[in-house]
């Protein structure tokens, strides 16, 4: 199993980094390509394990898929309608295959998915939404099976709770439904907006993405087209926090400030100088005192849960005692005990973590537990005294495109290695 060896330093992280395309947009867009009857080209797709798994899954369904810079998908040859367990077991996003399959082919089945172990992420909202569009759903032998005679039917759907994943499933399926679908209490994340842009490029008629009411006028078919994936706002935020906690200055290119306004506001509150341009953001912490901030995670445009672990680390290194409340997922403080192994001060009370400040962390052997928490451990290693070993880095590879190379370019000392048995 691969690990990171991180040599800590008091030197600030300084330099420039190019942000990759957003995994959370690239995945639904690749699955949404199932809806098309002609070839599509998707640019700015990050190099990640989940992307590779998705491309393999599309191939298993019969699509022609190749990557040379952009990802090219020809879904016209799809002739299988089942996403099998051996591919799905590592990745929750595979549920996004179900809506497009039943919408275009009248049938689809997906093995109940795996992925990060952060709380309950039931597929109920996906299933309920597809049922309201007229699909018959059954659970058999560990598979979610969907079927419809003829086309799905447009409907007025009010989501029981805000869900990014279910919003994408319903929006994608409704593009080929007969009639108009109105989706109320929809999630508003930038990745949903980007998926809608992609579908509209292929001929869909979607309006209101980015608001809590999305309207989809069903069309009979989708053609081909080209699309570039939106920047990864979480990767952007991760590198900006790395600059802040190390007392450095980092410029992130190929990203936009409007994608993470809540994060930038909290960085400014923490004492950082934040500057933005059309396609870049910089954080400068040189000679500034890091101040703790209070955070409450919330659906977009609130503070993103995927930045919670990074700001937990920030609060541990900052003056004062910051309080972070997690409202999206339960069981999302698994990074806290690992950071405490490095000398951090923090107490968990229910869905809240209260951080104390320490002068400097000490190196330790720590274990990555989920995708975003893992990044906070790597950054902690960069600023700790001594040599930190981060285990189970496959979690990081699921969401960050060459994180060690990008951090090393800023002055970090991170080595990927495989421990011999």
From Swiss-Prot:
Keywords on record: Cell cycle, Cell division, Cell shape, Cell wall biogenesis/degradation, Cytoplasm, Peptidoglycan synthesis, Pyruvate, Transferase
Record InterPro entries: Enolpyruvate_Tfrase_dom (IPR001986), Enolpyruvate_Tfrase_sf (IPR036968), MurA_subfamily (IPR050068), RNA3'P_cycl/enolpyr_Trfase_a/b (IPR013792), UDP_GlcNAc_COvinyl_MurA (IPR005750)
Disulfide bridge partners, by residue number: none
Keyword Cell wall biogenesis/degradation: yes
EC category name: transferase
Binding site for phosphoenolpyruvate: 23-24
Annotated GO MF terms: UDP-N-acetylglucosamine 1-carboxyvinyltransferase activity
BP term (GO), one: regulation of cell shape
Entry EC number(s): 2.5.1.7
GO CC terms of this entry: cytoplasm
Sites where the protein binds UDP-N-acetyl-alpha-D-glucosamine: 92, 121-125, 161-164, 306, 328
Protein name: UDP-N-acetylglucosamine 1-carboxyvinyltransferase
Organism this protein belongs to: Vibrio vulnificus (strain CMCP6)
Gene label: murA
